[in-house]
Amino acid sequence: MSDFKVETKCLHSGYTPSKGEPCALPIYQSTTYKYDTTDEMVQLFDLKAEGYFYTRLQNPTNDAVAAKIADLEGGVAAILTSSGQAANFYAVFNICEAGDHVVAASTIYGGTFNLLAVTFKKLGIDCTFVDTDASPEEIAAAFRPNTKVLFAETIANPALVILDIEKFAKVAHEHEVPLIVDNTFATPVNCRPFEWGADIVTHSTTKYMDGHAVQVGGAIVDSGNFDWDAYGHKYHGLTEPDESYHGVIYTKQFGKKAYITKATSQLMRDLGSIPSPTNCFLLNLGLETLPLRVERHCYNAQKIAEFLNAHEKVSHVNYAGLPDDKYYPLAQKYMNEGRTCGVISFELTGGREAAVRFMDSLKLATIATHVAASKTMILHPASHTHRQMNDEQLAEAGVSPGMIRLSVGIENVEDIIADIEQALKNA
């Protein structure tokens, strides 16, 4: 459905019922699938035929939703995972192994920072972090001969730094590696990174795509634009025979879908992390209203950011929809109509203590370790999502001790502002 607008794709992509079939995407709640002959199963196990034989690898419900997300991003193929962290892990591990190196922007979600800095190190994969605002030359200086990936977020969580996608893509491609971008906060409604040079996109579908805080999931989408064969000496897992699958060469047999096919047939087979069909069904319900919700999230966030920016007890507001924000020009360039997301981060003049008093005084907004849900939620990143980071790492991630992250919901904006206003009196 490449010719349709995003609102139409959110409703119709991925699943097209035939005569007499359900209009709503069915939940295929089954682990296994029946075949009539032994040879039919052989063809599936040898990756010589398409089909389903075990839900840990593929499921019709899951695949329909993955196809929808791929279409929304403009990719050739996608896979769903059981969480956003699983998506980021698979996206990198699919093309990295012990002895390899990753370069990543420092202003990223705390869990992803730990994944790259700590967990991958245990697997023999090193990571060097660079400032998102660094020059191309400074980013390039972090690369090594064994660098396989450049990783960043379109909108950093929680610093709300807007990524200069073209700058990062240019450096990545000059060093013959793909740019992987986590597009969770922007969503394909507001930004499509492939149009600016990114090669692979990840999502925590738990956030805006779901929108109701009822399922945990992730997604990986491949643009199909990175030429793995051209750099086969680096990406031999894709360009050389896979001994665990009868010597299949993914790029030769699956072309532009090689990357996603390998992630499905190899990583899902060995590591699991597949979402349940019911979770994918719930995700699909969220996707159907994604454009409507994102528009309201952004409208409300803009009004609240303007209110906070003018309040005497607020020392600083991070929101690229504000003309005086450092990242306003990048938001105007990369984001649909300059809209970013429904998340605001800000700091009070009273610092950390004032932040705690403010948050504890809120009546409508919920203190919760979540973001991008329909209801307004708030947390203190240094104490919550980024608690495992030391002071130096917090500074690199753009997280100050007094920073507050506000995930603006789709309630009436006047009610949200009234709640914030009364809480500020106690800050």
Model-inferred region functions:
Residues G74, N146, K313-H316, L364, ...:
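Glycine-centered tight turns that cap/initiate beta-strands
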Residues M1-N59, A67:
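N-terminal "arm"/small-domain region of PLP-dependent enzymes with the aminotransferase-like
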Residues Y15, Q29-Y35, G224-N225, L287-T289, ...:
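Glycine-rich beta-alpha junction loops
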Residues A117-V118, D126-C127, P145-K148, D360, ...:
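PLP-dependent enzyme catalytic core of the Aspartate aminotransferase-like
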Residues L271-I274, T278-C280, L285, T289, ...:
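Conserved small-domain helix->loop->beta segment predominantly found in fold-type I
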Residues T37-F89, G111-T119:
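Conserved N-terminal alpha-helix of the aminotransferase class I/II PLP-enzyme fold
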Residues E7-T16, A78-A310, N318:
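Conserved PLP-enzyme active-site core in the AAT-like
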